[in-house]
């Protein structure tokens, strides 16, 4: 079998099983698993020579250097199958006795509105209120695969629908193509990075700036500057809770005064899996500008935590309590 045919077969079956990720590992043989509703399921095994060939095929498609076999690398590419285009994000990791590739499958044609993101009714209203702002910094946090990009793209759709705004995005990589947005893909190898690109787009008269991720002090500082100069800035950051987002920004050198001036909202989100109904639930916690200010001033503050969102879902009979047991046990 040709490698393009084998790859198409693997992706076809992954999509059929609604997998979010494809795991491939070569040791004595090639083992392939799909992540379905949070759990890994075995799909197939192949002889080791086929394993090396399909791995090299995937590396080639995703612009991963096949000569650097001992170096972890990432890549990505768009893939057309079954009349749809999917964005495939690839991670290659070498071990002492094995090679591993994980492919994240991102659905380019499935567009969720902010009203469809979560069963938590307060979530859409909170995001809509952020979209109505003309300036400030809004941050979305969560673990890898928690839907941060999905939330930002849904907000972009709402902003596009509102009209009258020049929207520029900086992404690494571009996961979903949006009309009526100027999308710029980061490429460190060619000198295209968040810091330098942010400085450039400020001359492009933007109203809204989406930054794929705040990952270093330079990007954090420029994001603050953009928000201070009258732009609405949306971005993601790695932190597990809303409060840790604030601490993360402080650790990146942002002053409390600047956070008070520009941070208009925080969402931290988790993915929960309802195996009985075979669905994915985005569970958010939401921190408003008022709560952020109270926290920074060491006053009493309150915001919608994961536990409160979980209790809301249970009270409205939208979710069974056993799915949210970890959140319900939070102090």
Outline where the language-model segments fall.
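Short, flexible helix-loop junctions that flank or precede catalytic/ligand sites
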Residues: 1-331
């Amino acid at each position: 079998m040709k490698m393009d045919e084998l790859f198409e077969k693997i992706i076809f079956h992954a999509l059929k099983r609604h997998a979010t990720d494809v795991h491939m590992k070569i040791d004595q043989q090639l083992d392939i698993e799909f992540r379905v509703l949070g759990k890994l399921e075995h799909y197939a095994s192949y002889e080791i020579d086929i394993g090396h060939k399909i791995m090299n095929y995937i590396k080639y498609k995703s612009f991963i250097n096949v000569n650097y076999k001992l170096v972890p690398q990432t890549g990505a590419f768009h893939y057309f199958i079954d009349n749809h285009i999917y964005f495939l994000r690839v991670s290659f990791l070498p071990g002492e006795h094995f090679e591993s590739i994980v492919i994240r499958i991102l659905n380019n044609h499935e567009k969720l509105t902010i009203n469809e993101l979560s069963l938590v009714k307060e979530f859409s209203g909170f995001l809509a209120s952020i979209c109505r702002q003309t300036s400030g910094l809004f941050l979305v946090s969560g673990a890898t695969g928690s839907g941060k990009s999905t939330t930002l793209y849904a907000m972009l759709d709402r902003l596009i629908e509102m009209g009258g705004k020049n929207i520029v995005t900086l992404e690494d990589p571009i996961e979903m193509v949006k009309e009526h947005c100027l999308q710029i893909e980061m490429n460190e190898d060619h000198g295209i990075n968040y810091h330098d690109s942010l400085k450039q787009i400020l001359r492009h008269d933007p109203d809204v700036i989406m930054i794929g991720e705040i990952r270093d002090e330079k990007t954090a500082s420029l994001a603050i500057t953009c928000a201070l100069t009258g732009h609405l800035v949306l971005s993601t950051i790695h932190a597990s809770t809303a409060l840790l987002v604030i601490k993360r920004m402080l650790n990146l050198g942002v002053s409390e005064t600047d956070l008070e001036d520009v941070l208009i909202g925080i969402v931290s989100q988790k993915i929960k899996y309802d195996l009985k109904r075979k669905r994915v639930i985005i569970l958010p916690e939401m921190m408003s500008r008022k709560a952020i200010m109270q926290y920074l001033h060491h006053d009493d503050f309150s915001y919608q935590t994961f536990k409160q969102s979980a209790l809301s879902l249970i009270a409205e009979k939208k979710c069974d309590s056993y799915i949210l047991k970890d959140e319900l046990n939070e102090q």
